């Protein structure tokens, strides 16, 4: 059984975002006070915002992308507008995150 290509694209987008967010978070805390596997994505995003790495606007876009990706990954309905939002914003957000550290 193969997953629909849109669902695969959403998974890849979320995977890449989480990887970059975790990279920045781990690098900031250096020696992790808690294992990063136990720091949820929401905690990592909040920390990056509080540490000044993310603006409120960028954090909002990331949260929206992650929410849309979660719907698709769990086989819930995702509109064409939502798919386009993820496709049109993920690359820019990843470039933004890659430039941090």
Residue map of PLM features:
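Short C-terminal capping segment of an alpha-helix within the protein kinase catalytic domain
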Residues: 69-72
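Amphipathic alpha-helical interface elements
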Residues: 1-54, 60-67, 80-101
């Amino acid at each position: 059984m193969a997953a629909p290509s849109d669902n695969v694209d959403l998974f890849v987008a979320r995977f890449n975002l989480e990887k970059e967010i975790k990279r920045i978070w781990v690098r900031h805390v250096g020696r992790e006070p808690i294992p990063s596997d136990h720091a949820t994505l929401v905690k990592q995003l909040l920390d990056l915002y509080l540490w000044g790495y993310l603006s409120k606007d960028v954090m909002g876009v990331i949260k929206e992308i992650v929410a849309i990706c979660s719907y698709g990954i769990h086989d819930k309905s995702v509109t064409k507008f939502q798919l386009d939002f993820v496709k049109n914003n993920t690359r820019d957000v990843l470039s933004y995150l890659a430039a941090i550290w």
